Regions:
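Tandem repeat scaffolds
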Residues: 17-119
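Sec-dependent N-terminal signal peptides
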Residues: 4-13
Length: 119
């Protein structure tokens, strides 16, 4: 019985450490499918990051800084943009919809209309 409890605790600890966040997001981006879905990136400093084709569905981007980042082809459906900064970010070919919150800044010519990014 003690072995089962110990194994359960170890497995739980491994899964708890594997949540995508602002400290380990690179591991998730570099994985198959660039899966950063539901990633917790609140306040993350991603200035100039190259996130082409990233799956950011449902990610919490609250207060994150994406200034001059490259998000071409990224999937942003259901992400939380509250207070995020996307000044100068490259958003060509993104997939968006059901975006929550209002970002502080978007790239020139872009707007958020009914949860969808439009240029």
């Amino acid at each position: 019985m003690k072995k089962i409890i110990l194994i359960t605790m170890l497995i739980s600890a491994l899964f708890a450490q594997s949540d995508c966040n602002k400290k380990n997001w690179q591991e998730y981006y570099n994985s198959d499918g660039r899966d950063m879905s539901d990633c917790q990136l609140q306040g993350a400093m991603l200035r100039g990051a190259r996130l082409m084709g990233a799956d950011l569905t449902g990610a919490d981007l609250t207060g994150a800084n994406f200034t001059q980042s490259r998000l071409m082809g990224a999937d942003l459906i259901g992400a939380n943009f509250t207070g995020a900064n996307f000044t100068g970010a490259k958003l060509v070919g993104i997939i968006s919809g059901d975006i929550r919150g209002v970002p502080d800044n978007l790239p020139e010519g872009w707007s958020l209309v009914d949860g969808t990014l439009i240029k």
